[in-house]
Regions:
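Positively charged n-region of N-terminal signal peptides that target proteins for export
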Residues: 1-8
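Surface-exposed, polar/charged interaction patches used for macromolecular assembly or partner binding
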Residues: 8-9, 22-367
Length: 367
């Protein structure tokens, strides 16, 4: 190999290495403060938004170890100061010590969470996506001691199964059935929690007393064990998702046509695809195909004639795909087998069903 070729290869390797370093470097927000005093109601994401262009990368700003369950706890009143360590921005904490008028140390308010758990607590407990056939085989509510069609807190309902006295169950109604965007694969059925109750009498038909209601409970709904504590993650460590194939927005939890910041969405990938709680995706709208008509002019999809639509589908020579359009960021907070639920943390444009979910640009390479 001649010397110029060697130099060219070496230059290419240097450029690749530099691009890795660039992608891994935190970008500070223009006009960021040098320090910040934590306030009650803040989240780690909110605080990082004062300093970072990509606030979801707050673990790197704190220099946390992702293997530690609670790598960093900060509290209202703590002062955060921006410093640079080996050229990288970091936040260091000066703890605030609360004292009583007598000078005694007082207990701190609760630690600041990664995201506002109040936004997702109900979804963590109430929503599941399960196998359709499995759901249909669950024990069924037959009715109740009262002759009412609807049952509320304090009522006793009858379950078509022998259950263990003292066990706690959730009552679920069947919601939407989900299929994948491209293959039409069955992804499961939405199970919506209507009530919770405890078994008070066992038999071929068991009795359950309702302890809480989210919706009115009716005959035909299904019951399954509810384990509220196991469904509540103590900590979300945001990190880049990196799947083999793009995910898609499957549905809006509230069945909205368009979603914005802090709305909850279902996506069409789950644990079997490698999705985990804390995974962050960039959201994109597919770029449209522009057709070049007989006059050599570009025609958008909503302006095409029937002929131009057919032409675009049979000949790529007359169709040009526009770039995908960035919509925002989504963080997964609950994972099922084939689907997951995520919170839209950033949105620059409205998010819709079928929007594409990709690895965030800032972390296309491993840290």
């Amino acid at each position: 190999m001649d010397s110029p070729m060697k130099r060219l290869i070496l230059l290419g390797l240097i450029l690749i290495n530099c691009s890795f370093v660039f992608a891994d470097t935190l970008t500070l927000k223009s006009g960021h403060p040098d320090s910040y005093v934590v306030e009650k109601g803040d989240t780690l994401w909110d605080i990082s938004a004062h300093f970072l262009k990509d606030p979801w990368r707050w673990p790197k700003l704190w220099g946390v170890n992702p293997q530690i369950a609670n790598p960093h706890l900060i509290y209202p009143g703590d002062r955060l100061t921006l410093v640079f360590i080996d050229g990288e921005p970091r936040l260091v904490v000066k703890p605030h010590i609360r004292k009583s008028p007598e000078g005694r140390k007082m207990a701190k308010d609760g630690a600041i969470p990664a995201v506002n758990l109040a936004l997702i607590n109900s979804y963590l407990i109430q929503n599941r996506v399960v196998d359709r056939d499995w759901f249909d085989e669950l024990p069924m509510v037959l009715g109740g001691e009262s002759e009412s069609k609807h049952h509320i807190v304090g009522d006793v309902i009858y379950i078509q199964a022998e259950l263990t006295v003292g066990d706690k169950f959730g009552v679920y109604e069947k919601g939407r059935e989900f299929v994948s965007y491209e293959e039409g694969e069955d992804l499961g059925v939405e199970a919506i929690l209507t009530a919770s109750g405890r078994v008070i009498e066992s038999g071929s038909v068991s009795k359950v007393r309702l302890l809480s209601n989210y919706r009115e409970t009716v005959a035909g709904t299904r019951v399954m064990p509810i384990e509220e504590d196991s469904l509540m993650p103590a900590y979300f460590m945001p990190r880049a998702a990196n799947l083999e194939t793009p995910a898609r927005v499957l549905a809006s939890e509230k069945e909205l046509r368009e979603m914005g910041k802090l709305d909850v969405a279902y996506i069409d990938k789950g644990s079997i695809d490698g999705v985990e709680a804390g995974h962050v995706f960039s959201i994109y709208r597919d770029g449209v195909d522009v057709v070049i008509n007989g006059s050599g002019q570009p025609v958008l999809p909503n302006e095409r004639s029937s002929y131009e639509t057919v032409l675009s589908s049979v000949s790529s020579d007359n169709s040009i795909k526009m770039p995908d359009v960035y919509r925002g960021k989504l963080m997964v907070f609950k994972v099922f087998d084939k689907t997951s639920m995520g919170l839209i943390m950033i949105n620059e444009r409205p998010v819709r069903v079928e929007d594409k979910l990709l690895t965030p640009d800032a972390l296309l390479v491993s840290e």
